[in-house]
Amino acid sequence: MGNFIQPKGSTSTEIAREILSKTYSINYSEIDFIKQNLSVNGLKLLIDPNTQYIWGTISSLETGTISSWSIDSTGEIMTVLTTNGTLTLRKISVSTSTTTANSIYNFMTSDDIYNIKNVVGIEINVDYALQKAINSGLMSIYYPPSKGIYVHSNVCTLPSGFNMYGQSRKPYTVSNDASFNNCGTVIRLASGSPGIFVLSGRHTFDNIVFDGRNNTVGSMNATSQVSGCRFEKCGFYRWGIGLGRTSGYVATVYARGCNFSGNNTAMQDWIDSRAVDCTINAQVSRGIAMRTGANNNAWVGCRVEWNGTDGFYFYQSVGNVITGELIDRNGYAGITVADGASVSVTTCSIQRNGRISSNTNNGANILINDSGIILLNGNRFTSGVDDGGTGVLTPDYDIICAGGTGKILIASGNSFSGGNLGYMKEVTIANKVITGNYGLPDIVNTGTYQKSSGLVKMGNTSTGTLPPAASNGTLTLSLSRPAMTQYMIPQKIVLEISARDTIGGRAEYFTVPLLCSWESTVPVINMISSKLDTYPDNVWGPSTNTPTGVQVSVSTTSDGSTITINLVSMDTRNRQIQAYIRGA
């Protein structure tokens, strides 16, 4: 940072002294520029006119007048010879330029400044300095990069809109305290503290490394739900929750260019929030966890990899969006969507997930549990082992559907390479709209027109077993179609029935056109028996055709939205039946 640029002449002294007076809450008369024959009586701070560096102890200097002064080889200690003896002063701010930038140094003791600037890894609690800055009315403060570590212990409450800046490098992963040595601006949670400071909201934090020490609490401590906080180029390490509260929600968070590693969970329980260009790597547990009510969040260009369990975990959290980058080698599924949660995922590489979960329902790139909803578009799914060629080949499947019913999977324009055991495993059947993907065939099993195995169907497919005639062999199947309206133009559809004789091992089918109309008080379904096709011949048909195997009749509901198929066995065969309708 450059030095404070001052005008020449007496105005120079006046500006610098006025700035320092307000910053340190001391009298204007207690500050002066160092020079020969200057009386130090009553002075607290000296300014070097050549460098603009600030020297002193913020306590009254000795008496006497200055005859000479010198600075030691470290640049941190000034020796001043006066008519009454020798003064030893320490540099308490880099220059008056850091005063104009509201440096935390300006509120720290000279001993603390010296130690944090010169002792690698030393922890200096600066609660007192931050509180002094807040009390002075400042609304932004600069934490200079230091060899030591700034420590806070939840003593200070940041006023709404209070901002904090630093200069730091972000470690990719961390293992212990030494991982933070020489990282620049590092703020560490005090041992046993519930937070670093109490947030009020609308804060901006820029280029600071935040260390949670022991994975116990969330970094965003507040007395109630906090909102409007921005984090630019920050790092979050060893927190219980990297960005989030220990309990409760945070809203309208904006994180850009941040690194997260070594936390239990990097991000948790956000509302209406965004993360852009962030790296979420090697958390102890989940990368991201959005739970009940943590709705409407977006991740854009974020890398989520090598986390202990799930990469993304959504539970009863709706309206979420993931766009771009990499979701790779997480211990469980890359993305888990459960119990009514919903997420849209586009243009991501989703690969090698389920790293520690082979032969379980977590062994997938995507896991849909219970009534989860996921939309996939333009993504690339692959499997693989660790970067070095070791480890287990995962995932087992690109997609696993498990848990209860009601889940929804919509996928188009993706590339599926298949997991170790296949493309998709359905422990429970999902409502699927899967079209136009590489590797995964088109499947639509919901809505008016459905598709499977290359066949387009109208409504659902119905299955059942038709026992032999001697066993009171009857079966009723229901098929859905769009509701009919009175005086509609008649519509021809086709009923398709396939059957397997489980006793004789024989394959059978029955196809017949149906004419749907509504001219009187109720809709009518007419079977056009002259156009039916059956195999073997005359085994299937309406009663008027005297079939030898199965007698078929059809009826419909009062609005024509359901077609009922009634089957009656006429022989000794036991049949497995599948029926559907299609357009003519």
Curated annotation (Swiss-Prot):
InterPro entries: Beta_helix (IPR039448), Pectin_lyas_fold (IPR012334), Pectin_lyase_fold/virulence (IPR011050). Its main location: virion. Transmembrane segments: none annotated. The keyword Lipid biosynthesis does not apply. It comes from the Viruses. It is found in: Virion. GO terms for cellular component: virus tail. GO terms for biological process: adhesion receptor-mediated virion attachment to host cell; symbiont entry into host cell via disruption of host cell envelope; symbiont entry into host cell via disruption of host cell glycocalyx. Keywords: Degradation of host capsule during virus entry, Degradation of host cell envelope components during virus entry, Host-virus interaction, Viral attachment to host adhesion receptor, Viral attachment to host cell, Viral tail protein, Virion, Virus entry into host cell. SUPFAM superfamilies: Pectin lyase-like (SSF51126). Functions as a receptor binding protein (RBP) and probably mediates the attachment to the host capsular exopolysaccharides. Displays a depolymerase activity that specifically degrades the K25-type polysaccharides of Klebsiella pneumoniae capsule. This is Depolymerase, capsule K25-specific. It comes from Klebsiella phage K64-1 (Bacteriophage K64-1).
